[in-house]
Amino acid sequence: MPDAAAAAAAAQDADAVMRDAPADAAAGGGDNDDDDGDDGTEEDEEEDDDEEGDEEELPPAEDPAAPEPVSALLPGSPNQLTLLFQGEVYVFESVTPEKVQAVLLLLGRSEMPPGLANMVLPNQRENRGYDDLLQRTDIPAKRVASLIRFREKRKERNFDKKIRYAVRKEVALRMQRRKGQFAGRANMEGESLSPGCELASQGSGQDFLSRESKCQNCGTSEKMTPAMRRGPAGPRTLCNACGLMWANKGTLRNCPKAKVESSVVATEQSNAAVSPSGIDNKELVVPNPENITASHGEVMGDSTPANEAEIGAPKAQSQ
């Protein structure tokens, strides 16, 4: 009996142990997880410390700055520009400080280098307003560049205008004038015959005026025609009608009154050209007697039929 009771008690203890084993295992697993979590946090902190140490030890890599171009004007040659860029030297001749200032303004710099300030001062005294405009920071670089281009173009344009004006002035001074106006070749040839002819032609102003105011073809006065026109003898030598026919057809019209008016003009000129002593030196214009007889013959011929008719009628009645 005691053995049976001991066996039953051992069986109950074994069952109790079997029931308590999962709970102990769960409790033990939680403790292990906590230990593992603590170990993980410690490892993370150590890794962060190592990374921070590495960052402190290795500074961040920076891009190497590009070398800026350096410009300088040599003291011995003020118009020579030297540029140093990436170890290479560039030398330019005949470069003024104004151009350097314009280039620096285009590159984004508003002031000249201190080494060039003293060299630009003499030019600033000559063109103070121009340099003040270039040194102003409130004006855009494009505006300054356009102003520089405009000034250069204006200088060239003014120079060309001065040259052309000087040449035209020399030509105008060499040309001959007549009554304040440029004389043409025809006038020059007519006036350059001989000084005696010029004095004779300019002796009487009335003859000159009367000759110019009459049409050379029909003798029409200047006051009797709308305008005097160009003819074969030159300008203002024909009346309006003769001038239009000459310009359109190239021929002069037939004027029956031209002979009569020409004789009248000749008599007027002979009366006007009287010597100071009161004696007329020109010959009188006498009509040709043949023309007179011919004209009378024509008149008689025209009148004969009428006379014959008048004479023949009474004879017929008498018979």
UniProtKB/Swiss-Prot annotation:
<feature type="compositionally biased region" description="Acidic residues">
    <location>
        <begin position="31"/>
        <end position="60"/>
    </location>
</feature>
<feature type="region of interest" description="Disordered">
    <location>
        <begin position="292"/>
        <end position="319"/>
    </location>
</feature>
<feature type="domain" description="Tify">
    <location>
        <begin position="74"/>
        <end position="109"/>
    </location>
</feature>
<keyword id="KW-0805">Transcription regulation</keyword>
<comment type="similarity">
    <text>Belongs to the type IV zinc-finger family. Class C subfamily.</text>
</comment>
<protein>
    <recommendedName>
        <fullName>GATA transcription factor 18</fullName>
    </recommendedName>
</protein>
<keyword id="KW-0539">Nucleus</keyword>
<feature type="region of interest" description="Disordered">
    <location>
        <begin position="1"/>
        <end position="74"/>
    </location>
</feature>
<keyword id="KW-0238">DNA-binding</keyword>
<dbReference type="InterPro" id="IPR010399">
    <property type="entry name" value="Tify_dom"/>
</dbReference>
<dbReference type="GO" id="GO:0043565">
    <property type="term" value="F:sequence-specific DNA binding"/>
</dbReference>
<feature type="zinc finger region" description="GATA-type">
    <location>
        <begin position="215"/>
        <end position="242"/>
    </location>
</feature>
<dbReference type="Pfam" id="PF06203">
    <property type="entry name" value="CCT"/>
</dbReference>
<dbReference type="InterPro" id="IPR013088">
    <property type="entry name" value="Znf_NHR/GATA"/>
</dbReference>
<dbReference type="InterPro" id="IPR010402">
    <property type="entry name" value="CCT_domain"/>
</dbReference>
<keyword id="KW-0804">Transcription</keyword>
<keyword id="KW-0010">Activator</keyword>
<dbReference type="GO" id="GO:0008270">
    <property type="term" value="F:zinc ion binding"/>
</dbReference>
<keyword id="KW-0863">Zinc-finger</keyword>
<comment type="function">
    <text>Transcriptional activator that specifically binds 5'-GATA-3' or 5'-GAT-3' motifs within gene promoters.</text>
</comment>
<dbReference type="GO" id="GO:0005634">
    <property type="term" value="C:nucleus"/>
</dbReference>
<feature type="compositionally biased region" description="Low complexity">
    <location>
        <begin position="1"/>
        <end position="15"/>
    </location>
</feature>
<dbReference type="Pfam" id="PF06200">
    <property type="entry name" value="tify"/>
</dbReference>
<dbReference type="InterPro" id="IPR045280">
    <property type="entry name" value="TIFY-like"/>
</dbReference>
<feature type="domain" description="CCT">
    <location>
        <begin position="143"/>
        <end position="185"/>
    </location>
</feature>
<dbReference type="InterPro" id="IPR000679">
    <property type="entry name" value="Znf_GATA"/>
</dbReference>
<dbReference type="GO" id="GO:0006355">
    <property type="term" value="P:regulation of DNA-templated transcription"/>
</dbReference>
<keyword id="KW-0862">Zinc</keyword>
<keyword id="KW-0479">Metal-binding</keyword>
<dbReference type="Pfam" id="PF00320">
    <property type="entry name" value="GATA"/>
</dbReference>
